[in-house]
């Protein structure tokens, strides 16, 4: 089967695509897969390194308000549509699937005019504009949150699957002992892992910095903080190197180990992170990043809060007092900690990848039988 996968711009769109590619290859090693992205997007540096065939088209996000960039964006969109058409004619896909980001718009839209079956996956509780438009044309679409379906057209084509994540997080508990040693943390203490995504979060760093005295003067928990590479030197300069109960790192590559030792996670609410937290059944305090597209991070966080899986603090309300008090409240009440953890697990879709690929195969097979 010839399959085109498209999605890009951020890791939140790219890694679900990679997860689906891995499952499609596992299902049939003869599946021929082409990833379509943009040259400027993060996908151009990630996807080719994985040995996946990669082609680019020209496209950029169209500004919501008309400005000097609007004409350039429209010009690139039409160029991208022509390039998408050329790729489709040459590759002749049986199936085209998008995972979001404006790059997937031209290739999926043009694919709906061919014999290929077309589908997309939406990671966020409030869907992006590209997928909202595409819902009018595709054969099927998959969502992480059932709350997002109301924003789409053709709601009978929606399937709730959760967010596909890679299999690096299976059985992380076996790493817990070595991870505790790595972070030099006592087995008798609870652990809070604070991070703001791959680039860190200045607002989380500042709140942590300002509660150093409180952290040092208690013996209930220890904190592992990933500041982000660009923020690390400044944090250490302001905090000093040795702080009781606080372990500071610029970036954590083996995040599975950090998850393994943690009882409570404090983080932003990107779709991939939430999929990981629910897969692992981790209690969390979510601090959605303000000013994200369509404010999607707050929508994601509220979905978890509504289901009793997390506590939410908005960035405008975050300071050392609100954060420390919330951490202390959760870790002082084992019933609350367990409840958050159990409800988080209930939001997990551990077979998301398999379920999506099953549906995709059914979609193609229905067409063949017809």
From Swiss-Prot:
One of its GO terms (cellular component) is plasma membrane. Pfam families: Glyco_tran_28_C, Glyco_transf_28. The keyword Cell membrane applies. It is found in: Cell membrane. Gene3D superfamilies: Glycogen Phosphorylase B (3.40.50.2000). It catalyses: di-trans,octa-cis-undecaprenyl diphospho-N-acetyl-alpha-D-muramoyl-L-alanyl-D-glutamyl-meso-2,6-diaminopimeloyl-D-alanyl-D-alanine + UDP-N-acetyl-alpha-D-glucosamine = di-trans,octa-cis-undecaprenyl diphospho-[N-acetyl-alpha-D-glucosaminyl-(1->4)]-N-acetyl-alpha-D-muramoyl-L-alanyl-D-glutamyl-meso-2,6-diaminopimeloyl-D-alanyl-D-alanine + UDP + H(+). It is an enzyme of class 2 (transferase). Belongs to the glycosyltransferase 28 family. MurG subfamily. One of its GO terms (biological process) is carbohydrate metabolic process. Its EC number is 2.4.1.227. Pathway: Cell wall biogenesis; peptidoglycan biosynthesis. It comes from the Bacteria. The keyword Cell division applies. This is UDP-N-acetylglucosamine--N-acetylmuramyl-(pentapeptide) pyrophosphoryl-undecaprenol N-acetylglucosamine transferase. Keywords: Cell cycle, Cell division, Cell membrane, Cell shape, Cell wall biogenesis/degradation, Glycosyltransferase, Membrane, Peptidoglycan synthesis, Transferase. Transmembrane segments: none annotated. It is a peripheral membrane protein.
């Amino acid at each position: 089967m010839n399959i085109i996968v498209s999605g890009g711009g951020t890791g939140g769109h790219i890694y679900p695509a990679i997860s689906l590619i891995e499952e499609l290859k596992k299902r049939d090693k003869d599946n021929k897969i082409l990833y379509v992205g943009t040259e400027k997007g993060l996908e151009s540096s990630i996807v080719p390194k994985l040995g996946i065939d990669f082609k680019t088209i020209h496209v950029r996000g169209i500004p919501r308000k008309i400005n000097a960039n609007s004409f350039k964006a429209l010009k690139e969109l039409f160029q991208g549509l022509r390039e998408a058409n050329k790729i489709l004619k040459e590759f002749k896909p049986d199936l085209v699937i998008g995972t979001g980001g404006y790059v997937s718009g031209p290739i999926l839209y043009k694919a709906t005019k061919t014999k290929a079956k077309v589908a997309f996956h939406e990671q966020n509780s409030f869907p992006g504009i590209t997928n909202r438009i595409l819902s009018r044309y595709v054969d099927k679409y998959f969502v992480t949150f059932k709350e997002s379906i109301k924003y789409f057209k053709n709601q009978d084509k929606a399937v709730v699957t959760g967010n596909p994540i890679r299999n690096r997080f299976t059985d992380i508990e076996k790493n817990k002992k070595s991870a505790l040693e790595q972070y030099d943390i006592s087995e008798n203490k609870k652990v809070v892992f604070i991070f703001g995504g791959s680039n860190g979060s200045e607002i989380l760093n500042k709140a942590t910095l300002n509660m150093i005295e409180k952290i040092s003067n208690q013996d209930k928990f220890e904190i592992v903080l990933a500041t982000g590479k660009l923020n690390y030197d400044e944090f250490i300069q302001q905090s000093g190197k040795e702080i009781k109960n606080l372990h500071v790192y610029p970036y954590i590559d083996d995040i599975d180990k950090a998850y393994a030792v943690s009882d409570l996670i404090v983080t932003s609410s990107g779709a991939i992170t939430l999929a990981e937290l629910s897969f692992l059944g981790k209690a969390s305090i979510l601090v959605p990043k303000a000013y994200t597209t369509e404010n999607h991070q707050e929508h994601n966080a509220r979905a978890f809060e509504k289901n009793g899986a997390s506590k939410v603090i908005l960035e405008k309300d975050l300071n050392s007092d609100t954060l420390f008090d919330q951490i202390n409240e959760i870790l002082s009440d084992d019933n609350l900690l367990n409840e958050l953890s159990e409800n988080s697990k209930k939001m997990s879709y551990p077979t998301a990848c398999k379920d999506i690929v099953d549906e995709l195969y059914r979609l193609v097979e229905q067409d063949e039988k017809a």
